Amino acid sequence: MQKVLVVGASGHIGRYAALAFKKRGWFVRVLVRDPEKLKRPGPFGEPLLEGVVDEIVTGDAAKPDTLFGIADGIDTVFSSMGLRSSKPGMSYHDIDYLGNANILQEVMLHDVQKFIYVSIFKADEMMEMQIVKAHEDFVQALKDSGIDYSILRPNAYFSDMLQFQKMATSGVIIWPGDGSLRINPIHGEDMGDICVDTAAPGHQEIDIGGPDIFTYKEMFTLAFTTIDKEPRIIFIPLWIVKGLHSFIKPLNARIADMLAFAIAVNEIDNTAPRYGERHMKDFFETFGGKNRTD
């Protein structure tokens, strides 16, 4: 039986990856800081993992002394671990790079055959952002390590799009640019299946999107219609957002990074190769009740 260690198993993709490996007959060990989180489903329908996976190990990737033996007997390591947003006293560099580097250092002490890592789509076009640089610093460390690897680059997840439905609930969506650029996000469960597929031998870097392509304007309209609201969308010219970014950058690095990301995704085509069978409209309709105000 093949054995996998899933790092970041309390997160959105980590949960789906752990479940997908288990369904394919793998022995699944998960590493988490707080095992209590695995006793309940995630906020976007992600599966609970207690009683599903074979072994739950408690450890903190930022503390190497808690990681001893985590990869003992493991064939493949999967990591989607990373900060969703920067926090006081903790940076993207600390977790997305150093945390994963600590995992890799421990992994190299064992006979692990493969390391699968979830990075960022079109990262080379957004390297000025802290979160992107941290991801790609680890990608380079992984490539330099000599271990077989797969680098997965999803463009976005369905759960990311719920922010637009929440905005729609307030009555208006405000967005940089003109809404003409395109994106095809993927459901976390479809992404989990791809994670298992890429455990096959051989170096791989894969761009990943979902089956349905939308312009941002079409995505916003769908966010409104699935909660029975009339679309109201305000687009802000990019030159205004860029000016705001230049003003904010020396004052607040976190907000500046958020603005930089908003600018970046409105200057590149975010469509990726199509995978999966689940659809954005169905996901919006499932969560629409939670975002509806009558």
What positions do the PLM features span?
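N-terminal Rossmann NAD(P)H-binding glycine-rich loop of SDR-like oxidoreductase domains
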Residues: 3-27, 31-32
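Substrate-positioning beta->alpha
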Residues: 99, 177-198, 204
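Terminal hydrophobic/aromatic helix or amphipathic segment near a protein terminus
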Residues: 218-267
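NAD(P)H-binding glycine-rich loop region in Rossmannoid oxidoreductase-like domains
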Residues: 5, 36-102, 106-109, 124
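Glycine/proline-rich active-site loop of Rossmann-fold NAD(P)-dependent oxidoreductases
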Residues: 159-166, 197-206, 229-231
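Glycine-/Pro-rich loop/turn segments that contact NAD(P) or position catalytic residues
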Residues: 83-169
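Amphipathic terminal alpha-helices
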Residues: 265-294
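Substrate-binding strand-loop-helix patch
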Residues: 180-189, 208-226, 239-243, 278
